[in-house]
């Protein structure tokens, strides 16, 4: 407002819309089940509409022209944000690193697969200072190619091209990442209320990195991985090394990859801390409209070039920071280092003595030499015995270092894309990599009817068939596109021994289904799903509905050699509300664990509801438990679960931890037993609304058809070949 503006008055209309302030429903009732994570990324938020197909749009992309434009960008310094040494390679590598580096293997969330760096909280993390400038530099290219290139793909490609321009022979690149259009609500980044709060709150014992809270992979709120100044900002390279090992492992990286990514990430570019962070404007989410989505603008000085402030650490790591070489290891091992501070006050390491020719030149004036630096994470590579051995090997063999880094960079930027079948473009590497969870192509030429006939004659119960198929498919994670029924890894270690898969029952069922696969030429993966489908069809028929469950042949069977057993450990279910099972008591409630699994499976709240009701009456509970089986006709796909839950003839009485009885209000007699997961379908107002739909007399067939549709969605969740 200008100086003549009147004082703000009360608006007679705006109180009707909660656009800025006021408590949300979840703030008023913080213990209520928050179903928002199932409703995010709705088609209503996507401006491209439901008919847009990104994979089809990619077919029209001129990839070579795009790469040429990106190469030109790397040396096209802009006055509003000048390039260090006339090159943006370091900046673009950082933008990509900080997008991909948020991935964690525990739940598959984070990473570069969605373009989430454009939105809160990542766009405003302290560790992402000035990535907003990098994305703004990319905007003219995004504008030019439009819908043919997603932001997610462009951000991932930018860093890859940066390394190419710097001189690295990169391993390859795949397109296929689709953009989201709003912040992710499902990702838990920690419960701290302030940026860079001490690490102690997310560790059982901060001196024991393995006690970092799951599923987190970063040591502090707002960081990508470790604090470059040391644990809680206190320099101790050995302690930092221990945190690095755990953090990178939670990103899916081993020690060699950790060293390669750390050193390779610091071979080009520099850190910026030549000034005071107090002079910076708020982050993008907090900045005023005049900043137009940018943040961290220096309000009291140039704030660009040599005066830029980002992490607060100041300096380059190598003598030639725009060139891919072995300069990082040469610098690290050639000198002795002493702890010092940057102009911004950040802890960093400086060489005790250094020859003038080994110093990097100033980013603006090549006649000026500057002092290089190392972070605590860099020094960790020198002092940790394992990291040191790897580092020295890299130092003495640049070709080996370059190859390991190129592969690790490819893994970093593609780990959350899922299997190779999702890769698009001319630069997809031919080599199959174990972390891609390779699956051989399956047959589609066998007689499906003959397989079903053998399943029907197998003597296996409907509950056995349905439970085994569900257990095989439920491992799918929409976050990083891992898991699922394709590959039939449920028959391999470690899945065959997971408690949640009921190993004894699973072994018995597989001993019947595997011979059927061999006899018919079908994959065991297909037979498992087809058996589940047959079970659902029989349950529907028992309820009076003759409905065929859709089936698409073509799943393959992965081998033990194609399966990294250790990497599948994070996919083990610790609870499955759909089968009414929890491994043990957790701080998180069973219904919250159910919600998390439903979100990873890509289910909506109505689909969650219909699957719970159907699986209960079919009798698919873990161990054959009776909890939630609100029917006198188990094995039939009836609406009995919902009619019982909504019947006021019953009361619900707690009988133990996570256990309840449903009792007749008049006689007090116990009718059924239930868990919290069962009762939340009737207690949560949103889920109850869906339950009432299925309890209606006119929706019995609708329930059966909706259940089959949701079931098929889960069975086909990993069938990217059908897209």
Curated annotation (Swiss-Prot):
Matching Gene3D superfamilies: 1.10.520.10, Peroxidase, domain 2
Name of the top EC class for this enzyme: oxidoreductase
InterPro entries xref list: Catalase_peroxidase, Haem_peroxidase, Haem_peroxidase_sf, Peroxidases_AS
Residues the record lists as binding heme b: 266
Cofactor binding mode and count: Binds 1 heme b (iron(II)-protoporphyrin IX) group per dimer.
Crosslink site: Tryptophyl-tyrosyl-methioninium (Tyr-Met) (with W-97): 225-251
Marked site: Transition state stabilizer: 94
Crosslinked residue numbers (Tryptophyl-tyrosyl-methioninium (Trp-Tyr) (with M-251)): 97-225
Subunit (UniProt): Homodimer or homotetramer.
Protein name per UniProt: Catalase-peroxidase
């Amino acid at each position: 407002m200008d100086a003549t503006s009147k004082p703000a008055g009360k608006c007679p209309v705006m109180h009707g819309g909660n656009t800025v302030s006021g408590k949300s429903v979840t703030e008023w009732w913080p213990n209520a089940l928050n179903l928002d994570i199932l409703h995010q990324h709705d088609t209503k938020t996507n401006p491209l509409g439901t008919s847009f197909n990104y994979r089809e749009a990619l077919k029209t992309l001129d990839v070579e022209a795009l790469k040429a434009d990106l190469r030109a960008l790397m040396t096209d310094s802009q006055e509003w944000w000048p390039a260090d040494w006339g090159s943006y390679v370091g900046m673009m590598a950082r933008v990509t690193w900080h997008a991909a580096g948020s991935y964690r293997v525990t739940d598959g969330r984070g990473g570069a697969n969605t373009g989430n760096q454009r939105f809160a909280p990542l766009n405003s993390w302290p560790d992402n200072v000035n990535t907003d400038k990098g994305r703004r530099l990319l905007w003219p290219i995004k504008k030019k190619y439009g819908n043919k290139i997603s932001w997610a793909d462009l951000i991932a490609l930018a860093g890859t091209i940066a390394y190419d321009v710097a001189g690295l022979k990169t391993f390859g690149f795949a397109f296929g990442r689709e953009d989201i259009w709003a912040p992710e609500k499902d990702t838990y980044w920690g419960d701290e209320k302030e940026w860079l709060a001490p690490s102690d709150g997310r560790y059982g014992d901060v001196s024991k990195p393995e006690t970092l809270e799951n599923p987190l992979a970063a040591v502090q709120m707002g960081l990508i991985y470790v604090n470059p100044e040391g644990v809680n900002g206190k320099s101790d390279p050995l302690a930092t090394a221990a945190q690095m090992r755990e953090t990178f492992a939670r990103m899916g990286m081993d020690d060699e990859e950790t060293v390669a990514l750390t050193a390779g990430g610091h071979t080009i570019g520099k850190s910026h801390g030549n000034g005071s962070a107090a002079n910076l404007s708020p982050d993008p989410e907090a900045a005023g409209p005049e900043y137009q989505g940018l943040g961290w603008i220096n309000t009291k000085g140039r704030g660009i070039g040599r005066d830029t402030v980002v992490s607060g650490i100041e300096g380059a790591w190598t003598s030639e920071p725009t060139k891919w070489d072995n300069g990082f290891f040469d610098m690290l091992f050639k000198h002795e280092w002493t702890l010092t501070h940057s102009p911004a006050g950040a802890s960093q390491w400086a060489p005790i003595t250094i020859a003038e020719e080994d110093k990097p030149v100033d980013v603006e004036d090549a006649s000026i030499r500057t002092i290089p630096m190392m972070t605590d994470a860099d020094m960790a590579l020198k002092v940790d015995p394992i990291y040191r051995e790897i580092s020295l090997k890299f130092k003495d063999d640049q070709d080996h270092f370059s190859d390991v880094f190129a592969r690790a960079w490819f893994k970093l930027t593609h780990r959350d894309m899922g299997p190779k079948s999702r890769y698009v473009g001319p630069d997809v590497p031919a080599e199959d990599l174990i972390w891609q969870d390779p699956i051989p192509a399956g047959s589609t030429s066998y007689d499906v009817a003959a397989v079903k006939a053998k399943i029907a004659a197998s003597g296996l119960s409907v509950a056995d068939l349905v439970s085994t198929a569900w257990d095989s498919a439920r491992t799918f994670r929409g976050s990083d596109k891992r898991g699922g029924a394709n590959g039939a890894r449920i028959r391999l270690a470690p899945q065959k021994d997971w408690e949640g898969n009921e190993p004894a029952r699973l072994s018995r069922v597989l001993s019947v289904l595997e011979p059927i696969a061999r006899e018919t030429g079908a994959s065991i993966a297909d037979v498992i799903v087809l058996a589940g489908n047959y079970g659902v069809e029989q349950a529907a028929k028992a309820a009076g509905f003759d409905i065929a469950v859709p089936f698409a042949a073509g799943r393959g069977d992965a081998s033990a050699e194609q399966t990294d057993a250790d990497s599948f450990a994070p996919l083990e279910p610790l609870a499955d509300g759909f089968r009414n099972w929890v491994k043990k008591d957790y701080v998180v409630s069973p219904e919250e664990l159910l919600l998390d699994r439903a979100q990873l499976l890509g289910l909506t709240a109505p689909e969650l509801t219909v699957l719970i009701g159907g699986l209960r009456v079919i009798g698919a509970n873990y161990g054959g438990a009776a909890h939630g089986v609100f029917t006198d006709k188990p094995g039939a796909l009836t609406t009995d679960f919902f009619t019982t839950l909504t019947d006021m003839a019953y009361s619900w009485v707690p009988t133990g931890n996570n256990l309840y009885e449903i009792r007749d209000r008049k006689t007090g007699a116990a009718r059924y037993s239930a868990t919290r997961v069962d009762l939340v379908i009737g207690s949560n107002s949103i889920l109850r609304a869906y339950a009432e739909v299925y309890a209606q007399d006119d929706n019995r067939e609708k329930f059966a058809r909706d259940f089959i549709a949701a079931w098929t969605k889960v069975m086909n969740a990993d069938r990217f070949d059908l897209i």
